[in-house]
Amino acid sequence: MGACRIQYVLLIFLLIASRWTLVQNTYCQVSQTLSLEDDPGRTFNWTSKAEQCNPGELCQETVLLIKADGTRTVVLASKSCVSQGGEAVTFIQYTAPPGLVAISYSNYCNDSLCNNKDSLASVWRVPETTATSNMSGTRHCPTCVALGSCSSAPSMPCANGTTQCYQGRLEFSGGGMDATVQVKGCTTTIGCRLMAMIDSVGPMTVKETCSYQSFLQPRKAEIGASQMPTSLWVLELLFPLLLLPLTHFP
């Protein structure tokens, strides 16, 4: 009789523990979006379906936005359950205007359906395309932002304050993402640092590679321009010596 009573108590305990585990499981919104948007702050809809997570997992929502002057905006957005990370809200501006802009927002939270941001109005507040009066007349750069690769990259005038042309390729993986984004344009950033040498955005990993030819071309032009007067000066000195064999003395 005592053994049966113990088994009964154990069964009740297991049922309560099982019910407690189910209660503890978190529900999160889940979606992955990769798109080009004209005005993501006003038009992007970030509502998603809900799924039950495994015990101990958190909710996360992460978005990365990249834009060049005169182009649409690339949006990479992810919502999911995650097993790693702690509760935190992060906003990072990797590259600031004028020229190219790259920013991200990330929210890791521990309550059911807490990754519930439905728009980017509070995240994307980038100024409108730079006015023509603020454009530099001396620098032009190929300009495009595209999913995959740029089919065309027209040469566009750069805004005052930009320092170089950027040409880079970003490869994303993780967080349900597997995508490549090509970016070209005027920027204030020096070198291959559109993402400020940061290799992760929320659950996504990032690999940034660049064409350094575009960084070197302006410098090569300057060197060539500085050497030309020297070459002409040397030729001017050598010219009388070259004429000596042709001179006849009486």
From Swiss-Prot:
Segments forming a coiled coil:
none
Q: For this UniProt record, give its keywords in alphabetical order, as a comma-separated list.
A: Cell membrane, Cytoplasmic vesicle, Glycoprotein, GPI-anchor, Lipoprotein, Membrane, Secreted, Signal
Quote a single Gene Ontology cellular component term.
Answer: plasma membrane
Q: Which gene encodes it?
A: Tex101
Q: Where in the cell is it found?
A: Cell membrane; Membrane raft; Cytoplasmic vesicle, Secretory vesicle, Acrosome; Secreted
**So what does this one do?**
Plays a role in fertilization by controlling binding of sperm to zona pellucida and migration of spermatozoa into the oviduct probably through molecule adhesion ADAM3. May play a role in signal transduction and promote protein tyrosine phosphorylation.
Entry keyword annotation includes GTP-binding: no
According to the record's subunit comment, the protein's assembly and interactions are: Interacts with VAMP3. Interacts with LY6K. Interacts with DPEP3; co-localized on the cell surface of spermatocytes, spermatids, and testicular spermatozoa, co-localized only in cytoplasmic droplets of caput and corpus epididymal sperm. Interacts with ADAM3; co-localized on sperm surface. Interacts with ADAM5.
What is the name of the protein in this document?
Answer: Testis-expressed protein 101
- Lipid addition sites, GPI-anchor amidated glycine: 224
Task: Name its GO BP terms in alphabetical order.
Answer: binding of sperm to zona pellucida; fertilization; flagellated sperm motility; regulation of flagellated sperm motility
Report the source organism: Mus musculus (Mouse)
Asked if the keyword Membrane belongs to this entry, the reply reads yes
Q: Could you say what a knockout of this gene produces?
A: Knockout Tex101 mice are viable and show no overt developmental abnormalities. Males are infertile.
Name the CDD domains on file: TFP_LU_ECD_TEX101_rpt1 (cd23622), TFP_LU_ECD_TEX101_rpt2 (cd23634)
**PTM:** N-glycosylated; by high mannose and/or biantennary complex and/or certain types of hybrid oligosaccharides; possesses different oligosaccharides chains according to its subcellular localization in the testis. Sheds from membrane raft by ACE and released from the cell surface of epididymal sperm while it passes through the caput epididymis leading to disappearance of TEX101 on spermatozoa; is essential to produce fertile spermatozoa.
> What glycosylation sites does the entry record?
45, 110, 134, 160
Q: How does it sit in the membrane?
A: Lipid-anchor; GPI-anchor
Q: Which residues form the signal peptide?
A: 1-25
Propeptide positions: the record gives 225-250
Tissue expression, as annotated, is:
Detected in testis and ovary. Expressed in spermatocytes, spermatids and testicular spermatozoa, but not in spermatogonia or interstitial cells. Expressed abundantly in testicular germ cells (TGCs) but mostly disappeared from epididymal spermatozoa.
Q: Where is the UPAR/Ly6 domain?
A: 141-215
Task: Cite the Pfam families for this sequence.
Answer: UPAR_LY6
InterPro entries noted in UniProt? Fert-Immune_med_protein (IPR051899), LY6_UPA_recep-like (IPR016054)
